UniProtKB/Swiss-Prot annotation:
It is a multi-pass membrane protein. It comes from Saccharomyces cerevisiae (strain ATCC 204508 / S288c). Residues 143-176, 473-482 have a biased composition (Polar residues). The chain crosses the membrane at residues 226-246, 255-275, 288-308, 310-330, 364-384, 400-420, 423-443, 546-566. This is Protein ZRG17. The gene is ZRG17.
Length: 605
């Protein structure tokens, strides 16, 4: 018994699904060969080939046909019988099979050979790659993609986490994967329990600025003002040396005293030139961490030093007068003293500034007045070209005034030798020393207040604060005068020749004298009370707000800048009320105290 050979299906991957599943028709030659082979295999009763019919080839599906079931793409897993066909004419196939069965009734072995015997299940060939690759047609891929789009309600996309990404994500959606915790930040569940902190703008303050050196100062001298001032100072140096040498040569102690005064004039002139040149640089006005108020406090420090040194000069002259009185007291107690002993005692007194009348002054009267005239001219030029030319001259020492005063006294000194030879020098020295002490102490007192960052009211004489106070006093005085006149006289309407109202003349009565009211208005306590009253009269300042006297701190840090610190206790109110109150207080203080920096601390309860 011969078993028919089973032919494996050959894959035709190049065919489309429509072509693969269509039953092709055979040609006449193919059909005859196909029918003869079948008849030979099955057997004909008469042994005569049957009539040629149109046969349909068995369909050969492509690899997609096998891949549609459980992912098996092996063609060796299914074996078909060539006699088994299906197609359009099912009845013809049935007749052929029926005839074959009837022909083989007598032969049992042949009948058994017609049965379909499945071959043993072959092991699929090992894949070429580790993972099987499934071929997907474009239609199947598009249908699968569309079904996935319709079935999945969420659009999840593949994202790659990069924890070391330097730049933050550009959108809020991309930051969802980086959010830590579940804080209900953007949800109504939070109920504003987690408020964002206030964004504080960093202070734009430099740590330090370059400080100019000596070469920078020389290269930035303003022309021609600084050169004129330096020329006058150089001439004063030569005049001081000449005056000192002439005083030692002719024993004129008055000239030695004059040379000391000229020396202080030179120092003051150089300080003013240095300060004006240094003020051209940025570090002078700009505050840094190293110098919070800049370098302009150097001007205050130098003014204080000159004022203190001037006070020492006045004390030196005063002590010499006391020493001379002690010498006279000793001479008057001894009966044996004479003029020669007085000269010996006078020479033992160091730095004696009391002059002796001698004949050399009368002999060299031309030299005397020539040196005095040169010093007088140079001191006057220094006063007007250097000291008064400075912006803050009224707040600094004016040493040339003392030099000019003493030089004027020396002009008339030779004329007083005959009349007041015994007491002229004592009186002149006492007056000059008193003037120096008064001027030096006045400057030193208020410059020390500025150095200690206290409240100095010297430069507030022309402030609008005093003008407002004066206008208030004038209005109150006018009301008092009108009320007193109304009590004394009956109310009669004044006659007017025109339709315009009669103007009221406001007269201001101020006390004049040595102790006037102007000195009282410059008291820091009075000014702070005036500022406190102005703040409390503001419309934004409510009755439930509290402002104490001790909560107002005013400091003067240099010749121009004031710093005002205010603390207010605010009961109730909103953020808008707080903002409006800050703006109103700042405007009020800027009107009262110009060039000030205001810091307002509001404590809300």
């Amino acid at each position: 018994m011969e078993t028919p050979q089973m032919n494996a299906i050959q894959e035709e991957d190049n065919l489309s699904p429509e072509v693969a599943f269509q039953t092709p028709k055979l040609n006449d030659s193919d059909a005859s060969s196909f029918s003869l082979s079948n008849m030979n295999a099955v057997g004909n009763v008469d042994g005569i080939p049957s009539q040629n019919r149109t046969f349909f080839a068995s369909p050969r599906p492509s690899s997609l046909f096998y891949s549609a079931k459980e992912g098996n793409n092996s063609s060796s897993s299914i074996i078909y019988n060539p006699s088994f066909t299906f197609g359009e004419n099912a009845s013809s196939n049935a007749n052929i099979n029926e005839a074959a069965l009837m022909k083989g009734k007598g032969n049992e072995g042949r009948r058994q050979s017609l049965k379909y015997i499945p071959a043993p299940k072959l092991v699929p060939p090992p894949p070429r790659t580790r993972s099987p690759v499934r071929g997907i047609s474009p239609d199947a891929g598009s249908s699968k993609r569309s079904s996935m789009t319709l079935d999945s309600p969420f659009n999840f996309t593949t994202s790659t986490l990069q924890p070391h990404q330097q730049t933050p994500p550009s959108s809020a959606a991309s930051r969802t994967s980086f959010r830590k915790g579940h804080r209900y930040k953007h949800s109504s569940v939070s109920m504003n329990f987690f408020q964002e902190p206030e964004v504080k703008i960093p202070l734009n303050i430099a740590k330090s600025l370059p400080i100019p050196d000596f070469n920078d100062l020389l290269s930035n001298l303003p022309w021609p003002k600084a050169y004129i001032q330096l020329s006058i100072a150089a001439l004063q140096i030569f005049a001081c040396l000449i005056t000192f040498q002439v005083g030692h040569l002719y024993s004129w102690s008055n000239f030695i005293t004059l040379s000391h005064f000229i020396t202080y004039d030179i120092i003051g002139s150089l300080v003013i030139i240095f300060v004006e040149n240094l003020s051209q640089f940025q570090v002078w006005f700009t505050g840094t961490i190293t110098f919070p108020f800049g370098l302009n406090r150097i001007d205050v420090l130098l003014s204080f030093a000159l004022a203190v040194s001037l006070c020492f000069v006045g004390l030196d002259l005063l002590f010499h007068i006391i020493e001379e009185f002690i010498v006279l007291f000793v001479e008057s107690g001894s009966s044996l003293t004479n003029n020669h002993d007085h000269d010996e005692i006078n020479e033992q007194i160091p730095h004696s500034h009391i002059a002796n009348a001698n004949d050399s002054q009368n002999e060299n009267i031309t030299l005397w007045y020539s040196i005095l005239m040169i010093n007088l001219v140079l001191s006057t030029l220094s006063l007007y070209k250097t000291f008064y030319a400075n912006k803050y001259s009224n707040l600094k020492t004016k040493n040339p005034i003392i030099t000019i005063t003493y030089t004027a006294y020396l002009f008339i000194y030779p004329l007083l030798l005959d009349l007041l030879s015994s007491i002229s020098d004592y009186l002149a020295t006492l007056v000059i020393s008193s003037l120096i002490l008064w001027h030096g102490l006045t400057i030193a007192r208020w410059t020390s207040t500025v150095l200690l960052m206290g409240f100095s009211t010297t430069s507030l004489s022309n402030s609008a604060l005093f003008n407002n106070n004066d206008s208030t006093d004038t209005t109150a005085h006018t009301q008092q005068v009108e009320s007193k006149a109304a009590k004394e006289k009956p109310s009669v309407r004044p006659r007017s020749m025109s339709s315009l109202p009669i103007a009221t003349k406001n007269t201001k009565i101020r006390k004049t004298g040595f102790l006037n009211s102007a000195g009282f208005t410059e008291n820091p306590t009075t000014i702070k009370n005036m500022i406190k009253d102005q703040i409390e009269r503001l419309s934004e300042f409510k009755s439930r707000y509290i402002l104490n006297y001790d909560d107002i701190v005013i400091s003067k840090v240099n010749f121009t800048l004031y710093v005002v610190l205010i603390k207010i206790t605010m009961k109730g109110g909103s953020d808008d009320d707080e903002l409006m109150l800050r703006l109103a207080i700042d405007k009020c203080i800027q009107t009262s105290i110009p060039t000030c920096e205001t810091t307002i601390d509001i404590d809300r309860i």
